[in-house]
Structures are given as structure tokens and as C-alpha cells.
Amino acid sequence: MTLTKSMMYKAIRNKKIKVNRKRCTYDQKLQEGDSILLFLPYEFLETRQKACPVNTGSIDVVYEDDDIVLVNKPAGLLSQSDEKGLQDTLVNRIQYYLYQKKEYDPQRENSFAPAICHRLDKNTSGLILAAKNARALRLMNDAISCHKVRKVYCAKIEGTPLWDTKEVLCYIKKQETKALVAAEAKPGYKEAHMHVKVLKRQKEYSIVQIFLETGRFHQIRASMAYLGYPLCGDIKYGYKGSRKSYSLCAYHLEIGDVDLPIANKDFTIPISF
């Protein structure tokens, strides 16, 4: 790891670098066998020079200001890199977009790498907020934690429910790559709460609107399958038709009171299924 000269001088001035457990000076010469202690936060250390982002695909910008960019993520695209380290992700595309606009310079000292404020599963499409600076990321993450950001989903499900609206309360446990659902509280299971409204009924499928009170692993997919109405195309959770990508979209977003220009704005994108 490397430490820039300016950071090193600041660390010495603030007594964050010691030689043989004693404060060092700017002109001190090291001797063989000296012990050097660094009391530095991780962000002061650079493991390598940040590479410039590459163009892996375009993004669909729904809204943008000096702090936030709101994009419509397509199904099939990862929100961020997984354990495989895949480069074509929504985060990489956003960073390249801002790099082209000269709003992001990865090689500038202490530059902030634009980041998403929340994520969607790979095969879920819809609205995702991304922050252009650290302040915006902190404020938006706080707003999400305080439930000041409301996401509404739309899904195409197998079957036609007899009810028009339904409050769903169950319990979910993540087991490897699948969510297990229980009707009552059990060890290892977490409460999963959501509201479902039928928007349209066809002969073999329906379109429903879903609002989550909690954000559990595969909550919508597992809960709808638990009710007997799996998402169309969702083989993992019981769909009996042909194998294809399931139909789920975070199509509506409401921003509450937050100290950013995007405050108190609503956004809706069209549904393609």
C-alpha cells in the first residue's frame, strides 16, 4: 500500500506515525531494525491507483441533479459486482457515465466513487438511486433507514387471486440461494410484511402492485409463491410454465424529506409486461 506525501506529512504532524514507539520527525532517517507504527484510518491508504471506468453499456437516466442520479436498471444486469468480480454492473455503468461528463475522476486524490444507495436483484428491473458524492450517499442512506424513501413494485403472477388487496405477514429464512417461508415465527426466521393489490386480471395471470414494509431476501418472490401465485417465469419458486426471466419491476419511487434537491419528488416508469 502507498501513502501520498501530503497524507504522510499530515500524519506525522498529528502524531499518527511513530518510530520505535516515539513520535517521528519530517527529516528522521530510519535505521535497520526500526519499528514503524501507523495509526491511520483505512481510507488514508491506497491499495492501488483507481482505474478509469470502461464503457460496458448505457444507462437509462430518469432524473439527475448535482447530488443524485436516478436510473432505470434493466433486468439481467447486476446492481453491483458480486464475488465473481464481474465488470458489467449498474455501478460501473453509472461511474463511466459520470466520468464521461467529467463529474468523476477516479485518479484525483481522495475522489469519491459514485455509488448506489440501494440495490435490486439481477433479474429485477426498476428504479435505483445513486449518489455522486459522500454527503448525498450518507443523507440518502439515512433517509432509506428512516423509511423516508418508498419503493413500490409491480409483478406479473401466475393465476388470478379472488381478493383485490391483501396484507401478507409471514416469516422468511435465507437458505443458500433460496428463501424458506413459514406462517409462524420460528428460530432463524425473520418477519416479512408486505401489501399486495391486484391491478389487472387475465385468464391465466394477473398484474399486482406490491409495497414492502420489510426487505427480506427474495421476499416478493417467496411470499407470492407461498400464497400460491408465483411470479411468471420464476421456476425457482414454483412457476410451472416455460423457463424465462421472472417479471418484477420497482416501478414507483417516492422521496420524502431529505436535505437534497430530490426531496419530496415522486417518480414512475412504465411497465413492459
Regions found by a protein language model. Give the residues of each.
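RNA pseudouridine synthases
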Residues: M1-F273
